[in-house]
Amino acid sequence: RHQIAHVARWSRPRLRPCDLANAVSAGKTQAVPYGVTLIMAPWNYPFLLTLEPLAGALAAGNTVVIKPSAYAPASSAVLKQICEEAFDPRLVTVVEGGRAENEALLDECWDKIFFTGSVPVGKLVMERASKNLTPVTLELGGKSPCIVDATANLKVAARRIAFGKWLNVGQTCVAPDYLLVDTRVHDELLGLIKEEVRRMFGEHPLDNEDYGHIVNAKHFARVRGLIDPDKVVLGGTARESSLKIEPTILDGVTPDDAVMQEEIYGPILTVLTFESL
């Protein structure tokens, strides 16, 4: 509804000033559809991160091919069913599959590619798109820090950090990846975060049906391998049979530790300290 209500205003021609050499001319910009677009969606929030760009693409007058992630096959099947029931296939088409299908789609010449996912795959998408000078929107991950100084409201900070970190068991591109905390409030903040974790998931998170799973065995092994037992101050236990890892805090981490060399994308919060900003 929002797109439909505003797209006419968004696409209205807009007058633009001209430079001195073209002072007698009149300039304007005109918004037009890109054309045939490709949306490559991730597995962590498959409906939101597929349907949101789809709504924008359709409102702007484009046709769309959707490629859901093979890591979420059940969601992919539901998205395909919804689109087949709601849209003419000439307007919206869903292509399911894995790496082979991704490669085949990237061999095509698109008018626009919208990709959400990891940095390595994002680099590949941009490289392949560059061969046809296809414009690309990349929504990638990163190591998002939380910085807490001595003036912060620690209860609010703890609640927000815990929610952002362990929502979807850390499998969120904007989840806090590591915590930079003033040494003066370090102990109090960690105590409050631990309280929030217990409030959210109870004393036994691995038995909590509302506490999520790591997406697959490959990612489970990678995330578990980042846990340094000597630095665990909360959690640290993993259950391979259910692909669950406890909400885990690693304290006393240094920038050279293995866990600081890549995006965690799991339920591990690493803690570093500072004396002053």
Which residues make up each language-model segment?
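N-terminal Rossmann-like NAD(P)+-binding subdomain of aldehyde/semialdehyde dehydrogenases
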Residues: 1-28, 199
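Short loop/edge segments at beta-strand edges and connector loops
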Residues: 11, 96, 234-236
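ALDH superfamily catalytic-core signature
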Residues: 87, 120-255, 273-277
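Structural alpha-helical scaffold elements that stabilize or flank donor/cofactor-binding regions
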Residues: 30, 104-106, 223-226, 264
